[in-house]
Swiss-Prot record:
It is found in: Cytoplasm. InterPro entries: aa-tRNA-synth_Ic, Rossmann-like_a/b/a_fold, S4_RNA-bd, S4_RNA-bd_sf, SYY-like_C, Tyr-tRNA-ligase, Tyr-tRNA-ligase_bac-type, Tyr-tRNA-ligase_bac_1. Disulfide bonds: none annotated. SMART domains: S4. One of its GO terms (cellular component) is cytosol. This is Tyrosine--tRNA ligase. GO terms for molecular function: ATP binding; RNA binding; tyrosine-tRNA ligase activity.
Length: 422
């Protein structure tokens, strides 16, 4: 199967230019392709995984992936389908973010291959060398303002009475077009990939290459993933799901995939994993069987957590899951409890709680001591996964894991971690 056909079967293609020519090109030679990432935050998030994994799919088959960090363009901000002007970032902030996301990207691609090693570039390399008059003369003259303002992303902003679009953001399209042109000239890049919201920017790059160099370049966009509630993929009630384990713990990351809607399980297995497409289709055919979807969610969560955080962090996420959902606390490690303390479950810090009823109220697992007493009597409360039925139970040192933590649970899904201050 050729790569473009596989991308179609995995539902990875939203737009593609000159598909037959691109198929022929990558069939007959190895190409260089790129995707850009603006360092507007100090971590990538799960929404960035799709383009990174797609770059990897090309690299596995011999093509050379280039990651372009928008050290210059991030100072402007991409207006594509944004409802309002982005806040401008400082140079120092962008530099810090560039370093961090470059380190994250290094885990996804092979930078030590014989002939198609991935490389990371920063568009500061060329934008710091070009002045505004040169840019307007050499780039701006190839673009019609009429065409630019008719781009869907720009039109939406112009039509809003409360939010227009500044010339700063309006110029972003030309800056990204120039990126593609430079990479085509210097690195023989013939394909740019990105989210479907990047179609206008990619098209401008192809246009500029054709006008100046008389060469044909190609574009491929990936679907923007939305949840059924209309919220962008990767956003939860508790915020963005980051790739940085200091911002989203591996356990919380693992649970994000476990909690996706059933209707997305096989779609995401196709989009995000390298599991054979035929195996995924077979799994989907059997999804009516008892526990099959849950089993396949586990497969997805394992694959993604291993990909982003590695085997050790995956094991920790599985241990924590076993504690909270399957009451298996035997293999718990203090680092697992530190993960839970960071963003796994609600946390109460104290040094003086004595009785269980007070602990349940303080942890918000109960609204009152009376309710707490009734919960204990009805066999709903556990300490460190052990059921407690004594309504007058006093918490002591034996209930402290590693002399620092106590896990309170109400039923199967409501937990709170007590952290004992010394």
């Amino acid at each position: 199967m050729d790569l473009i056909n596989e991308l179609h079967q995995r539902n990875l293609i939203f737009h593609i230019t000159n598909e037959n020519k691109l198929k022929e090109l990558i069939k007959n030679k190895y190409i260089s392709l790129y995707c850009g990432f603006d360092p507007t935050e100090d971590s990538l998030h799960v929404g960035h995984l799709l383009p990174l994994i797609t770059l990897k799919r090309f690299q596995v088959l011999g093509h050379k992936p280039i990651v372009l960090i928008g050290g210059a363009t991030s100072l402007i901000g991409d207006p594509s389908f944004k409802t309002k002007e982005r806040l401008l970032k400082s140079d120092s902030f962008v530099e810090k973010c560039t370093l961090k996301i470059s380190q994250q990207i290094s885990f996804f691609l092979d930078f030590n291959s014989n002939f198609n090693s991935a490389i990371i570039l920063n568009n500061n390399l060329w934008f710091k060398k070009i002045n505004i008059l040169q840019f307007l003369r050499d780039v701006g003259k190839y673009f019609s303002v009429n065409a630019l303002i008719n781009r869907e992303a720009v039109k939406k902003r112009i039509k809003r009475s409360d939010q227009g679009i500044s010339f700063t953001e309006f110029s972003y399209n030309l800056l990204q077009a120039y990126d593609f042109f430079i990479l085509n000239q210097k690195n023989q890049v013939s394909l740019q990939i990105g989210g479907s919201d990047q179609w206008g920017n990619i098209s401008s790059g192809m246009h500029l290459i054709h006008r100046i160099s008389k060469k044909e370049a190609y574009g491929l966009t990936l679907p923007l993933l939305m949840q059924s509630n209309g919220i962008k993929f990767g956003k939860t009630e508790s915020g963005t799901v980051w790739l940085d384990p200091q911002k989203t713990t591996p356990y919380r990351f693992y649970q994000f995939w476990m909690n996706i809607e059933d209707s997305n399980v096989y779609r995401f297995l196709k989009l995000f994993t390298f599991i054979d497409i035929h195996e995924i289709n077979e799994r989907e055919k059997n999804s009516y069987k008892k526990n099959q979807i849950v089993s396949d969610k586990v497969l997805l969560a394992k694959h993604m957590t291993r990909l982003v955080h590695g085997d050790e962090k995956l094991s920790a996420a599985e241990r924590i899951t076993n504690i909270l959902f399957f009451k298996n606390i035997n293999d718990i490690q203090i680092s697992d409890l530190e993960q839970l303390r960071k963003d796994g479950v609600p946390v109460v810090e104290t040094y003086k709680i004595k009785d269980l009823q007070e602990a349940l109220v303080l942890s918000s697992l109960a609204q009152s001591r009376t309710q707490a007493k009734n919960m204990i009597i009805s066999n709903s409360i556990s300490i460190n996964t052990k059921k407690i039925v004594n309504k007058n139970y006093i918490i002591d040192d034996n209930d402290k894991l590693f002399n620092q933590f106590t896990l309170l649970s109400r039923g199967k899904k409501n937990h709170c971690l007590i952290y004992w201050n010394k």
